[in-house]
């Protein structure tokens, strides 16, 4: 299959949204090398298996020799070194999501309850374990979702709630 960033049209906002879905949904998340920095590539397989883009240097810092296949043209910005230095990079976002998942049992092994909203562009679900409840809201649209309503059934979210933004706290 093609690399995620190529499927998403090289759109970093969409890649961030896809990462949020992947790392908050149930199951074992799988990342193909370079996905966390936005590497691109489409079939045939050789174009997906290009060298890891470590730096903006020649051959993306992968080798001082001549690689059997050239690195992708976006290696000057989509590389580990450049994104390590940028707090708002795709790599930093992946790291934040991975830390969030590792720090919260509900995201690792908790149950999943899909919630309904009156806005089809807002994906809402609850991840819950014996020790915590995490409400996940993901805006699937480029435009802000400022006005929407959630339908919550009695249960894990009943009573007084004190919401906390775990990702940007």
Predicted regions and their residues:
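Active-site clefts of carbohydrate-active enzymes
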Residues: 1-10
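Catalytic and substrate-binding clefts that recognize carbohydrates or anionic sugar/phosphate headgroups
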Residues: 16
């Amino acid at each position: 299959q093609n690399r995620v960033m190529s499927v998403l049209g090289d759109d970093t906002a969409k890649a961030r949204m896809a990462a949020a879905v992947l790392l908050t949904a149930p199951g074992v998340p799988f990342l193909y090398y370079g996905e966390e920095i936005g590497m691109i590539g489409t079939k045939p397989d050789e174009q997906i298996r290009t060298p890891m883009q470590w730096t903006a240097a020649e051959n993306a810092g992968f080798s001082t020799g001549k690689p059997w296949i050239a690195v992708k043209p976006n290696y000057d910005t989509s590389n580990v070194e450049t994104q390590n230095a940028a707090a708002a990079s795709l790599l930093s976002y992946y790291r934040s999501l991975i830390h969030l998942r590792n720090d919260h049992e509900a995201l690792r092994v908790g149950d999943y309850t899909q919630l309904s909203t009156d806005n089809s562009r807002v994906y809402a679900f609850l991840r819950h374990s014996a020790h915590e409840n995490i409400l996940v809201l993901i805006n699937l649209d480029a435009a802000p979702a400022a006005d929407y309503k959630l339908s919550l059934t009695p249960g894990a979210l009943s009573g007084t709630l004190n919401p906390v933004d775990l990702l940007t706290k």
